[in-house]
């Protein structure tokens, strides 16, 4: 089966392609479609699953092929609703933040609460045809909980500002200081959650054929 992953991010596509390799799926991304006109999508859902559904419906209706989309949100324990990022990790009070602005904002939030414990919640929505749709936002897809602090790591990487403030709970290290093996543990757990979702969906789909 040829399946479209609704992303233009090659790193995300490669990671998912590797994880789903044993399922007999030929995974392609948006950039593989060449000059095919793609829909404009307004991601205004209140949860990652709502946004994933909006995206997958738009792609399926426009491209008429099996497709899935993912979305994520950042959620902290024990914070006021107004301080909960959710799906608006980079947008605060309607403003899209730069890396530096994000670092300042979340450092101040961590200072306000004396440190924060958070996790990324991930969702996926899959449409195989007009009659077969599968959605999930399961705990198995969540990142491991981590600590967010108010003191930034001296190093910064473009596009990953929150890693400057994030502490791995297993090791007590900033994310930037994790070695490759340590950093891979959480990613593998998240990928396993997605693999289980696709295994269940494909098994159910083939039973109904």
What is each model feature region?
Residues 2-4, 11-18, 22-209:
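Anionic-ligand binding patches
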């Amino acid at each position: 089966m040829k399946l479209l992953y609704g992303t233009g991010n090659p790193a995300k596509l490669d990671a998912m392609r590797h994880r789903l390799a044993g399922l007999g799926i030929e995974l392609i991304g948006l950039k593989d479609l060449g000059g095919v006109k793609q829909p404009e999508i307004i991601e205004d859902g209140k949860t990652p699953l709502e946004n994933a559904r909006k995206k997958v419906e738009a792609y399926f209706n426009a491209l008429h092929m099996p497709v899935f989309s993912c979305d994520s949100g950042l959620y902290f324990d024990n914070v006021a609703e107004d301080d909960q990022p959710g799906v608006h990790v980079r947008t605060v009070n309607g403003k899209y933040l730069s890396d530096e602005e994000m670092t300042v904002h979340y450092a101040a939030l961590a200072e306000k609460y004396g440190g924060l414990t958070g996790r990324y919640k991930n969702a996926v929505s899959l449409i195989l045809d007009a009659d077969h749709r599968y959605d999930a936002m399961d705990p198995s897809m969540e990142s491991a909980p981590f600590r967010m602090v108010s003191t930034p790591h001296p190093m910064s990487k473009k596009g990953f500002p929150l890693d400057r403030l994030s502490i791995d709970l297993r090791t007590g290290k900033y994310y930037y200081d994790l070695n490759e093996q340590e950093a891979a543990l959480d990613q593998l757990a998240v990928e396993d959650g997605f693999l289980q979702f696709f295994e269940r969906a494909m098994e159910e789909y083939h039973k109904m054929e």
